[in-house]
């Protein structure tokens, strides 16, 4: 990691599953880590932390939240499939509000938590790179496609650079056969964020967030300039995962890269 940390970093979604992990892992990257979520956060702000409750759907609140930060790690929003109306505010309005606030306050680097669900309708026997047409598998995936488009637009129009991480499955360990291919360890996630923050000239880069798993569906050649070299592998957990009852061959988790998201809903 660089020896010159940021003065103030903003982490949205800090009360979420990955947000809690990153709160602990990112402390050395800035003099002050500003933490934000719509949900209460515990523990209270510690040394070199600021805790701010913020609804991403509230444009004025997001504008205030972003003031004074040097870079943004945007992990806030709904992180699973829901009705479109529930995703609209935090994921679609929210990402626009974050980028507008970044523009107004002169923030030039953002890490955007995108998702493998932007391409979830590709089949598991297909190998794709970041230039493959997107095939979202859900309203959630659709919202992440929009977020990537916002990132692209704000770079082309305003020079705000973004690394969009299409996160696979970031958990302590893979939980099923699909995750043997999509698993992203916490250490490798942090490495991706580090490379996204400190690599010069990223423009808008899309990178697939997966560890060094034996079976891979995603080709990161278009993000090679980041220098991301995953250190972990799902092979450590293969025996335990394969000991579980196997899903049917036509189960969505065995057919589509996005797994069960491809058949979630409809929501009335």
Curated annotation (Swiss-Prot):
Binding site for NAD(+): 17-18, 37-39, 55-56, 75-79, 144, 170
Gene behind this protein: udh
Active-site residue numbers: 140
Function: Catalyzes the oxidation of beta-D-galacturonate and beta-D-glucuronate to galactarate and D-glucarate, respectively.
Binding site for substrate: 79, 115-117, 169, 178
Pfam annotation, one family: Epimerase
Family assignment from sequence similarity: Belongs to the NAD(P)-dependent epimerase/dehydratase family.
Keywords: NAD, Nucleotide-binding, Oxidoreductase
SUPFAM superfamilies: NAD(P)-binding Rossmann-fold domains (SSF51735)
Subunit text: Homohexamer.
Gene Ontology MF, one: nucleotide binding
pH dependence, record text: Optimum pH is about 7.
Thermal activity characteristics from the UniProt entry: Activity increases with increasing temperatures between 4 and 42 degrees Celsius. Activity is below 20% of the maximum after exposure at 37 degrees Celsius for 30 minutes.
UniProt KW Oxidoreductase keyword: yes
Name this polypeptide is given: Uronate dehydrogenase
Known pathway: Carbohydrate acid metabolism; D-galacturonate degradation via prokaryotic oxidative pathway
Enzyme Commission (EC) number: 1.1.1.203
Catalytic activity: beta-D-galacturonate + NAD(+) = D-galactaro-1,5-lactone + NADH + H(+); beta-D-glucuronate + NAD(+) = D-glucaro-1,5-lactone + NADH + H(+)
The keyword Oxidoreductase belongs to this UniProt entry's keyword annotation: yes
Catalytic EC class: oxidoreductase
